[in-house]
Amino acid sequence: MRGDEYIAKILKDEGVSWLSCFPSNPMIEALSKEGIRPIAFRHERGAVMAADGYARVSDRKHIGVVAMQSQAGAENSAGGLAQANADNIPILVLPGGNPLNMLFVRPNYFAVNSWTNVSRHAEFITGPAETGNVMRRAFHR
C-alpha cells in the first residue's frame, strides 16, 4: 500500500468525511477513493480557514483536514495554521512534499521547520512504514 492510500484509510477510520484542499496534492485523489469528499479552494489559507471553521462549529469534536501543494502552498497556509493553533482548534494539515532525495536541498521550503512555531506538532513522513505512528501522534496528541 502506498503512503497516500494508507493515510486516506487512517483518516477514514478516524471519521474524516471531507477535506478542504488546494489542488495539486496526491492526497486529494487517495482520499476521494476512500469516500472522503474533497472541497477545493482558491487559496491555501482559505482552505485552512474552512477546516478551522468546521472544527469550531463542531465544538472541537471533529478535526478539520487540509491538503495543499508543497513549497508556496504550504507557506501560504501558515497564517491560518497559526490562528487555529492560537485558538486551540484541531486541524490536520497535509502538504505535498519533495522527493526524499530533495528533502533538504535549498531553496526548497521545509514546512515542518516553519510550522514548529505555529502548530502543536509538525513531523515529516519519509516512508509508508512510519505513517501509522505519525498519524496516531497527529490525532491523539
Task: Spell out what each predicted region is.
Residues 1-141:
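N-terminal alpha/beta PP-like core and its mobile active-site loop of ThDP/TPP-dependent enzymes
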